[in-house]
Amino acid sequence: MTRRNIFELMQEKYDHIKEVEKLSDLLEEDMILLGTKSLTLEEFVDEYEFDNWENSYHYINCEDLKESLGINETIKFCTRGYGISIEDTLVFLEYVLNIINICQRSICIVHNEAFFTKPYPRLIKNIEILLSNLNYEYIYFDKEEKVILVERDSAAFAVADIVEEELAFKVIEYNHYLLKGDLDKKRNILKALADKVEGFRDNLNKSLFSDFGYLANNINIRHNNLEGKNKKEYLLNIANEELEDWYDETYQVMLLCILENNYKTSITNKIKEIKGKVK
């Protein structure tokens, strides 16, 4: 029998529920030094930034927000050794990452005399390891003052780098875990992407553009295909799960269209340049 090294054993023993509990414990440690004050991340946010945060809505502090999101209940389950869902884990992580983002923005812009202390790098590292194990990534959107978690999708990130900021947010948001099963929100994002892709007609492979047009116009995205002149009988009895699968396929087709257009309008010119230099 082949002996496994300690690093293989460490990976095998990884438990996302225990990791959530560890992160919760770390969150209770002081991580910001401001003058003579030593504060936890949440204490810093509550005292200096919560009311200024664009996404605080009607909540009064971090504790109020955690209670509403069910995070306190999630942590209780972890500490008692009960199981928690991946979605509960992602809600907790997204909350923590937004608290971190608020602190980082504040220290960079307002409280530049403050600085993070030793537990902070460990918190960041453990979050990144947990996200990697879950196959998720976090994305910052400065304009919206928010951090969201999305499944890793290299095509989506490539497209987000190409398009304008508002559409980039929609491209990334499509993969947000809370949008699973939300056909209305997915449909609205696909409509916005369809408007973008339509302008690329002349640059796209005819077969690809034809498939894009068919999907955008016939599965209740651009048009109401459930009634009226554009009604499609097949859609009247289709299960939501199957329709969502087709929405996800359409999303991938639209990403391909945007990437192909970028290749033909930008990348090919760069390749011509390098060909002229490297012979």
Task: Identify the role of each PLM range.
Residues 87-105, 195-199, 248-260:
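Short, hydrophobic/amphipathic alpha-helical patches that form generic packing surfaces
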Residues 65-80, 166-181, 230-237:
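Short amphipathic alpha-helical segments and their helix-coil junctions
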Residues 168-197, 201:
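A mid-sequence, solvent-exposed acidic-amphipathic segment
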Residues 86-169, 175:
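Helix-loop junctions and short alpha-helical segments
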Residues 85-95, 119, 185-192, 211, ...:
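Residue-level detector of well-ordered alpha-helical segments, enriched
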Residues 1-127:
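Charged interaction/catalytic cores of defense and host-pathogen modules
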Residues 81-84, 115, 180-188, 242:
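Conserved aromatic-histidine-acidic binding/catalytic patches
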Residues 191, 201-279:
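Alpha-helical oligomerization segments
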